[in-house]
Amino acid sequence: MYYIKKTIEVAACHRLELSYPSKCTNLHGHNWIITIYCKTRKLNADGMVCDFTHVKEMIHGKLDHANLNEVLPFNPTAENIARWIVDQISSCYRADVQESENNIASYEED
Protein backbone atom coordinates (compact mmCIF):
# COMPACT_ATOMS: atom_id res chain seq x y z
CA MET A 1 0.00 0.00 0.00
CA TYR A 2 1.22 3.50 -0.86
CA TYR A 3 0.34 6.50 1.31
CA ILE A 4 0.63 10.27 1.06
CA LYS A 5 -0.21 13.03 3.51
CA LYS A 6 -0.89 16.62 2.43
CA THR A 7 -1.28 19.49 4.88
CA ILE A 8 -2.88 22.74 3.77
CA GLU A 9 -3.86 25.95 5.51
CA VAL A 10 -7.21 27.59 4.90
CA ALA A 11 -8.45 30.92 6.23
CA ALA A 12 -12.25 30.80 6.41
CA CYS A 13 -15.20 31.83 8.52
CA HIS A 14 -18.33 29.99 9.61
CA ARG A 15 -21.09 30.00 12.14
CA LEU A 16 -22.60 26.89 13.60
CA GLU A 17 -26.26 26.05 13.95
CA LEU A 18 -26.47 24.39 17.35
CA SER A 19 -29.22 23.07 19.59
CA TYR A 20 -27.77 24.93 22.60
CA PRO A 21 -26.53 28.49 23.29
CA SER A 22 -22.92 28.99 22.16
CA LYS A 23 -20.60 31.76 20.99
CA CYS A 24 -19.95 29.55 17.95
CA THR A 25 -23.37 30.46 16.55
CA ASN A 26 -21.88 33.88 15.77
CA LEU A 27 -19.90 34.33 12.58
CA HIS A 28 -16.21 33.78 13.37
CA GLY A 29 -13.07 32.72 11.57
CA HIS A 30 -10.23 30.25 11.89
CA ASN A 31 -6.91 29.63 10.26
CA TRP A 32 -7.70 25.98 9.66
CA ILE A 33 -4.96 23.39 9.25
CA ILE A 34 -6.24 20.48 7.20
CA THR A 35 -4.33 17.23 6.83
CA ILE A 36 -5.44 14.90 4.07
CA TYR A 37 -4.42 11.25 3.92
CA CYS A 38 -4.62 9.25 0.67
CA LYS A 39 -3.70 5.69 -0.21
CA THR A 40 -3.70 3.25 -3.09
CA ARG A 41 -2.50 -0.26 -3.84
CA LYS A 42 -1.38 0.71 -7.34
CA LEU A 43 0.29 3.96 -8.34
CA ASN A 44 -1.24 5.93 -11.20
CA ALA A 45 0.38 6.24 -14.63
CA ASP A 46 2.57 9.05 -13.29
CA GLY A 47 3.88 6.94 -10.42
CA MET A 48 1.84 8.72 -7.74
CA VAL A 49 -0.94 8.01 -5.28
CA CYS A 50 -2.27 11.37 -6.46
CA ASP A 51 -0.75 14.75 -7.23
CA PHE A 52 -0.19 16.87 -4.11
CA THR A 53 -1.09 20.00 -6.08
CA HIS A 54 -4.42 18.55 -7.22
CA VAL A 55 -5.29 17.58 -3.65
CA LYS A 56 -4.61 21.14 -2.50
CA GLU A 57 -6.56 22.71 -5.36
CA MET A 58 -9.65 20.57 -4.71
CA ILE A 59 -9.94 21.74 -1.10
CA HIS A 60 -8.06 25.04 -0.82
CA GLY A 61 -9.65 26.42 -3.98
CA LYS A 62 -13.15 25.91 -2.61
CA LEU A 63 -12.66 26.82 1.07
CA ASP A 64 -9.91 29.45 1.35
CA HIS A 65 -11.19 32.93 2.27
CA ALA A 66 -14.77 31.68 2.10
CA ASN A 67 -17.78 31.80 4.34
CA LEU A 68 -18.20 28.05 4.81
CA ASN A 69 -21.93 28.43 5.41
CA GLU A 70 -22.22 29.73 1.85
CA VAL A 71 -20.07 27.14 0.06
CA LEU A 72 -20.86 23.92 1.94
CA PRO A 73 -24.33 22.29 1.95
CA PHE A 74 -24.25 21.33 5.66
CA ASN A 75 -23.62 22.73 9.13
CA PRO A 76 -19.85 23.42 8.85
CA THR A 77 -18.58 21.74 11.99
CA ALA A 78 -15.00 20.49 11.88
CA GLU A 79 -16.35 16.92 11.91
CA ASN A 80 -18.62 17.52 8.92
CA ILE A 81 -15.83 19.27 7.02
CA ALA A 82 -13.50 16.31 7.60
CA ARG A 83 -16.12 13.91 6.19
CA TRP A 84 -16.74 16.19 3.20
CA ILE A 85 -13.02 16.27 2.38
CA VAL A 86 -12.80 12.47 2.37
CA ASP A 87 -15.80 12.36 0.04
CA GLN A 88 -14.22 14.87 -2.39
CA ILE A 89 -11.00 12.97 -3.13
CA SER A 90 -11.27 9.41 -4.43
CA SER A 91 -8.10 8.05 -2.80
CA CYS A 92 -8.62 9.93 0.48
CA TYR A 93 -9.38 7.76 3.50
CA ARG A 94 -8.82 10.23 6.35
CA ALA A 95 -8.91 13.96 7.01
CA ASP A 96 -7.94 15.95 10.11
CA VAL A 97 -9.46 19.41 10.45
CA GLN A 98 -7.80 21.65 13.03
CA GLU A 99 -9.59 24.88 13.86
CA SER A 100 -7.25 25.83 16.72
CA GLU A 101 -4.22 24.42 18.48
CA ASN A 102 -6.40 22.39 20.83
CA ASN A 103 -9.42 21.55 18.65
CA ILE A 104 -9.04 18.90 15.95
CA ALA A 105 -11.70 16.71 14.35
CA SER A 106 -10.93 13.65 12.23
CA TYR A 107 -12.90 11.45 9.90
CA GLU A 108 -11.57 8.11 8.68
CA GLU A 109 -13.31 5.58 6.46
CA ASP A 110 -13.48 2.02 7.79
Residue ranges and their predicted role:
Residues 1-110:
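Charge-rich, low-complexity N-terminal segments
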